[in-house]
């Protein structure tokens, strides 16, 4: 929105040419989302607190979690609102990728909102039935994959790349591309949701991964950097740095209220939407495998649940004291802040490894 105004004003004053720089607008997007979150946060939390009941607490979970009963949830609505406003202000609204990612965020956020609404207002701790949740996720995930396939304007946009082996490029047919897009979008949507079980545990890795994906998006949209780093050149992908920056800013603003002990929880509205956005951006910039590395905390949390369920069904025994795995460490006696910070440290290391693949040929 403001970019179009700046382009018109540039004819009168060259200073407005700054808005043509992605990095400049990315910084503004992050700061806008951050300050909006800090400003609107208290009012949003007060409004959410009016829904008596708060986040349902697992009865078989750690005893320390019972003190969290009544804490407002659906705080992810603050993230979605501030990200959307920031992107609309600073993004290039003629870019199809911007609209696609916003659509994915809103659609998956709507699923999460309805799930949270059932849990809180209707007092149903199970929320939206799993089959309906996965059906809606599948519809939106497949729709995003189909859109990306049929709007691809360069072969690189539908080619599968393996980090550190940049000479290997696997062209994807329609079905294979859409299937991969579906699994990454829906998979990471649910992975972030599973990780969101402790105060601030999910949002900080999300911020870190979003920042790193912003670097990949910027490089993928730049002819010089893409050629130098031997990564796929995706015209228009650079604009995604605005969304990544907005997520980083909004995420830090939300963490101000979500840090231990949390004043508000993200809820499914935030976790499902942010995970889907990370998956979508990774698919657009053709860095699916790098996302698996950088989002390793989300992957580990998901695998722990899958292993736990499979082991119990096959042998009747549990591998972990409780899944997802962050609860396992809690039940081993780790204080919640220790679990959170150590998972953050792991996330920092994994993101750095992911960024290192930019230079490894």
UniProtKB/Swiss-Prot annotation:
Its EC number is 2.7.8.13. The keyword Transcription does not apply. It is an enzyme of class 2 (transferase). Pfam families: Glycos_transf_4. Keywords: Cell cycle, Cell division, Cell inner membrane, Cell membrane, Cell shape, Cell wall biogenesis/degradation, Magnesium, Membrane, Metal-binding, Peptidoglycan synthesis, Transferase, Transmembrane, Transmembrane helix. One of its GO terms (cellular component) is plasma membrane. CDD domains: GT_MraY. Coiled coil: none annotated. Its cofactor is Mg(2+). One of its GO terms (molecular function) is UDP-N-acetylmuramoyl-L-alanyl-D-glutamyl-meso-2,6-diaminopimelyl-D-alanyl-D-alanine:undecaprenyl-phosphate transferase activity. HAMAP family: MraY (MF_00038). Belongs to the glycosyltransferase 4 family. MraY subfamily. This is Phospho-N-acetylmuramoyl-pentapeptide-transferase. It comes from Xanthomonas axonopodis pv. citri (strain 306). The lineage of its organism: Bacteria, Pseudomonadati, Pseudomonadota, Gammaproteobacteria, Lysobacterales.
